[in-house]
């Protein structure tokens, strides 16, 4: 199973779920089953698993390290001076 950008997905990864409803969420990937890149597993958003955790569609998720790398590439990883 792989995220939108092709990175291998593993349970326990910290992810950005871009297509969560009603808004994107950051959480931990849980209960995903290898071999499926679509609606597979959940984005755990609290300290414990919940029935309200959004479904994680791998093609709509990114590993948080990749999101941080994109921000750094665009110069958005640091606060502007004077703020």
Regions found by a protein language model. Give the residues of each.
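Basic/aromatic-rich interaction segments and small domains that mediate binding to polyanionic partners
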Residues: 22-58
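Mixed-charge, Lys/Arg-rich low-complexity intrinsically disordered regions
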Residues: 1-14
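Short, surface-exposed secondary-structure boundary micro-motifs
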Residues: 14, 18-21
């Amino acid at each position: 199973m792989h995220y939108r950008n092709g990175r291998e997905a593993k349970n326990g990864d910290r992810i950005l779920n871009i297509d969560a409803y009603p808004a994107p969420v950051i959480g931990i990937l849980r209960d995903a089953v290898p071999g499926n890149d679509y609606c597979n597993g959940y984005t755990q958003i609290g300290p414990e698993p919940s029935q309200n955790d959004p479904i994680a569609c791998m093609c709509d998720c990114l590993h948080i390290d990749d999101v941080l790398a994109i921000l750094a590439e665009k110069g958005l990883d640091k606060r502007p001076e004077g703020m």
